[in-house]
């Protein structure tokens, strides 16, 4: 009975996640009615005088109560954790592989941090050259971070270094801040990189000792003290790494740069070395302490000599100029890597835990469509798009993810499909889904109309009528994209 109750409640949870319905209480009421009849049928034996019958009744009542507790509390809690977090739906639900790699990475991180802290204590009491001990510590620390990052082999990592940066010349390294792992991404690049960190990390009970021995710089020390400490480390050949945004970005967008990093580079008379991190916010979001698979790209840009005044004369002007330059370069990285293939996993995962048939249909459909790369290629990056017969919304989501300047309206006759499409975590204000008959509906003016495998469901006269309606609402230099089955190839269709 416990299995039956769990399946029944799970069905309610899946229906709620799939369609956005809040109807779990009706499933619980049905379970409670079954529990009541079971207790009345078997639990009444507790009043029997025969000890065996009483034992059976007591065990039945305890068993039923336990089953109901698990079904009503633990089961919904686990499902909720799989698909939601504190800000709403997860943009990609938790999967078994991601969970396993998250646990392994967590244990490796904690174990590595404690070992490095112990190693720091040992080095402190060994009578040897301080600089050599520090260098050994930094080399091992860098290798450990490399191991931790590359441990999750399901997530590809790319380091793009077109200018052959070797970090031999000290610099102020700046990078966008997306997740906790950004520090390790910087440390694995070279052992001679020190990071300016906050007091929470500096005095952390797990990795604080290792960070302090590695001579990371405490942000709370104040600018004068920080400059003094940084100047000494620069003389020893180290580069100083600072996140000019100050805080992690949950969306991946570049936030406002603070001028402290550039002031420090000016005072120390060293270059600024910009490094772009892309994809890390999707692997470990700021508001979601859980590792997911994804491609992480680290791009090292050319050094900037502030004394040449290429980005302005004052520190304020240089900060704004470098921020604008950084945003432009980040946009180039996005356009290079945020392709339909990059986003296909996001779309597939949004239809996970919504039923096995839909899950497999989604995977097969997107694979057969080759991630909708052709549509993304021919549809303008900035356009108003109406997708007639949008189905579950796969194409609409792909077009919206690959360009934030596409405004999309998806229309389909099937109300259930529209409900499913509307209830995805990746849905944003770019997309509007409408249930209705495209023959009767009035269309909004659009730059692009898409009729993808739709017209063959209509007779010829309605096909012509639908196309004429699209033409009437088409903007100047707009396009109508029609793809449909060829009846002459009926056996292959």
Q: Can you annotate each of these PLM segments?
A:
Residues 91-170, 349-365, 373:
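Membrane-anchoring hydrophobic helices of lipid-metabolizing enzymes
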Residues 226-352:
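Non-catalytic C-terminal accessory region of glycerolipid acyltransferases
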Residues 341-379, 391-429, 435-442, 458-462, ...:
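Class I (Rossmann-like) S-adenosyl-L-methionine-dependent methyltransferase catalytic domain
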Residues 120-138, 167-222:
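Catalytic core of membrane glycerolipid acyltransferases/transacylases, capturing the structured
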Residues 450:
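A conserved beta-strand element that flanks and buttresses the S-adenosyl-L-methionine
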Residues 3-11, 55-90:
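Transmembrane alpha-helices and their membrane-interface boundaries in multi-pass membrane transporters
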Residues 18-48:
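Pore- and gate-forming transmembrane helices of large, multi-pass membrane proteins
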Residues 464-476:
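A short glycine-rich, Lys/Arg-flanked "PGG" loop and its adjoining helix->strand segment in the class I
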